[in-house]
Amino acid sequence: MEALVYTFLLISTLGIIFFAIFFRDPPRISTKKMK
């Protein structure tokens, strides 16, 4: 059960960092890359 909690915490932390970097960059570049 502890392993599941630690995995969830790790994924949550990675998700928060990913969103922070994604939102830090200007949305214009992301939209242009997507098209």
From Swiss-Prot:
Name of protein: Photosystem II reaction center protein T
Similarity comment: family membership: Belongs to the PsbT family.
Transmembrane segments: 3-23
Function: Found at the monomer-monomer interface of the photosystem II (PS II) dimer, plays a role in assembly and dimerization of PSII. PSII is a light-driven water plastoquinone oxidoreductase, using light energy to abstract electrons from H(2)O, generating a proton gradient subsequently used for ATP formation.
Classification via Pfam families: PsbT
Stretches assigned to coiled coil: none
GO BP terms, alphabetized: photosynthesis
Quaternary structure note: PSII is composed of 1 copy each of membrane proteins PsbA, PsbB, PsbC, PsbD, PsbE, PsbF, PsbH, PsbI, PsbJ, PsbK, PsbL, PsbM, PsbT, PsbY, PsbZ, Psb30/Ycf12, at least 3 peripheral proteins of the oxygen-evolving complex and a large number of cofactors. It forms dimeric complexes.
GO cellular component term of the entry, any: photosystem II reaction center
Organism whose genome encodes this protein: Aristolochia macrophylla (Dutchman's pipe vine)
Protein origin, superkingdom: Eukaryota
PANTHER family, sorted: PHOTOSYSTEM II REACTION CENTER PROTEIN T, PTHR36411
Record key words, sorted: Chloroplast, Membrane, Photosynthesis, Photosystem II, Plastid, Thylakoid, Transmembrane, Transmembrane helix
Residue pairs linked by disulfide bridges in the UniProt entry: none
Cellular localisation: Plastid, Chloroplast thylakoid membrane
Main location: plastid
Membrane topology (UniProt): Single-pass membrane protein
